[in-house]
Amino acid sequence: MAGAIATLARPFGVNHNLIFSDSSMGSIDGDAEAAARYTEVELSKFALDTYFDPLLLKVTEYMPNYLALGKEPVSFITWCPPLVNHNNSKISVAYATNYPAVNLKESVSFIEYLCKKNAKSKDVGTYTVTDEEVLKYIKGPDFDSGCTVFNLAKKNNTDCIRDFLVNGSTTLYVMPKIELIKDSYKVRGGYADELVIREIPWGATTERIIDNIRNDNVKRVTEKADNSYIVKGRDGLTNCSRGVDNVEIRIRLKLGTNVKDAFNNVCTILLKDFNTAAHVTMVDDKGQPYRMISYSELMRAYLNRLYARVQQGLNFERKSLLLKNDLLEAKIKILTDKKNKVKFMDTIENAPNRTKAIKELAVMFKVSEDIIATIIDVAYSSSVNKGELFKKDIESNLKDIQAIDVHLNDINKFMIDKFKGIAKVHGRERRTRIVDTEKLYDANMLWKELVYTSRASK
């Protein structure tokens, strides 16, 4: 459990943290999280806004947990669109899921389109989602760490991004942005260049990248008498990172090194180690996997269930407000009228027991026994002067009921407004670039897309 909590709390673990903690949750360098006994956490604002919305929690069904010592949700519907917050691999018996996250703003725009389309259809509440609609709104994976995803075209006129969203399975080739600093540092004989990795692929750590580059350099020295391109010593390959937003792996090149050759070596290492096999496995009622699932299927199932749950929640809230008004009207009738209150108190005192008193009073004042039981608990402390307060509460509840009726008449609009509010607070612009290419190991293409040049100030 401590490991799962750490993953949800890391700024480089998921796109939107569900947990906030001041404890050590590991680092982008590969450091492990602190021991569980030192860990204190609380839910983040994103989790409270999306996963623990009061409207949906009121109608969530629960069942006994594994040990029957508590309860857990049968199904947990949230305001977080499908796969917005997935940047982790999940594995279980006989099946696994490894699906990178998509952008929250893109998902909300897509949901807004689907809700508007559904509102105009004859079968309101049952959503239809096509693959072409998905491809129009969802551009592909979006990692909090940025980077570039190469959309590799195939012979059958499909591509990696289409496979990712439509077929539920693909291989994504993720590469970081690399800065070339000309004349970065002074050496004997002149100034040498430096390559600086400013991003790291999803799931990688800076130390893992450094180890891979260092091992490749050592292999070159061993096999080809000193064919290395990195300066010897600890200054040749250094990690100056300060979190996921400030990644900085500095590769000092030897004087006279062909920069493009060194860059190609680094790219080859990263492409081999950090291509991601993305897939979502659909399971049947018995928990057995039988096929991959597309994003359109995920979105359709999500919206159908969310619509039904929102409708259920609004009706539950409306019914609760009506019951509150019935109680308030009964209080006005019984507690704010002196004669009725005397009758009420006398009946309580003369009845042989509480149950008998509740039944007599329910018949006398023509209200439910539950309302009478509630009024008995406050009868001795309630004042006849509270009538105006009760009336104000009734008026407030009636306004809330009218607002709920408006939402029930157009649940799609209610859902759009809710998602827009979440995107406004928690959404961010896309950080991951999508680059179409037909050949992955094209040195000129990689140089053009990944490298930007600066010159060190002297």
List each language-model region with its residue ranges.
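Long, structured ligand/cofactor-binding scaffold of large enzymes
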Residues: 1-52
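Short coil/turn connectors at secondary-structure junctions
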Residues: 14, 56-57, 80, 86-88
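General structural feature for long, well-ordered alpha-helical segments within catalytic domains
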Residues: 4-8, 39-46, 76-79, 103, ...
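Alpha-helix capping and helix-loop boundary segments enriched in small/acidic/polar residues
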Residues: 30-34, 67-71, 75, 98-102, ...
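Long, charged, glycine-rich C-terminal linkers/tails
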Residues: 16-26, 58-69, 224-239, 438
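Conserved alpha/beta core surface patches that mediate binding of polyanionic ligands
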Residues: 2-11, 67-79, 166-173, 223, ...
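C-terminal interaction appendages of subunits in large macromolecular complexes
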Residues: 82, 88-458
